[in-house]
From Swiss-Prot:
Misc remark: Has been extracted from the spider web.
Protein name, entry field: Fr.III-4
Record function comment: Is not toxic to insects.
Transferase keyword on record: no
Organismal lineage: Eukaryota, Metazoa, Ecdysozoa, Arthropoda, Chelicerata
Intracellular or extracellular location(s): Secreted
GO cellular component: extracellular region
Keyword Secreted found: yes
Residues with Arginine amide modification: 10
Keyword terms of this UniProt record: Amidation, Secreted
Organism: Trichonephila clavipes
Length: 10
């Protein structure tokens, strides 16, 4: 899990 996907857990 990268910080980007953590902001967009879609």
């Amino acid at each position: 899990l990268t910080p980007e996907t953590a902001s967009f857990p879609r």
